[in-house]
């Protein structure tokens, strides 16, 4: 199967946690790039009640060959009991960017 670019998204309760996890993923060559958003407000149902809270979204640019490993790594380190971990296939990535991703991820 051909290697495909993907984005993995997760949310964290603090910016510091999201930056730390993103930095480690890049340092460990599991992601080419990590981006942490500004504060977002999440609204969700938990334990029968509607709740809301501030979170920070971590976006990891990686390859399909790292998907299983990166999901397991994120799940193991995540502070939430039920972690939001989403995988989004990227239908287009600029050729030069994709080549760079393939160079730095292993």
Locate the predicted segments by residue.
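Positively charged, small/polar-rich N-terminal and surface patches that mediate targeting and assembly
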Residues: 1-106
């Amino acid at each position: 199967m051909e290697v495909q670019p993907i984005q993995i998204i997760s949310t964290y309760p603090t910016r510091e946690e999201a930056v730390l996890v993103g930095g480690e993923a890049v340092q460990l060559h599991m992601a080419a790039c990590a981006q942490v958003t500004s504060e977002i407000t999440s609204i969700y149902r938990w334990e029968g009640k509607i709740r809301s809270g501030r979170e920070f979204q971590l976006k990891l640019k990686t390859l399909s060959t790292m998907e299983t490993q990166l999901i397991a790594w994120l799940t193991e380190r995540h502070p939430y009991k039920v972690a939001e971990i989403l995988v989004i296939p990227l239908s287009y990535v600029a050729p030069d960017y994709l080549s760079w991703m393939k160079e730095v991820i292993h």
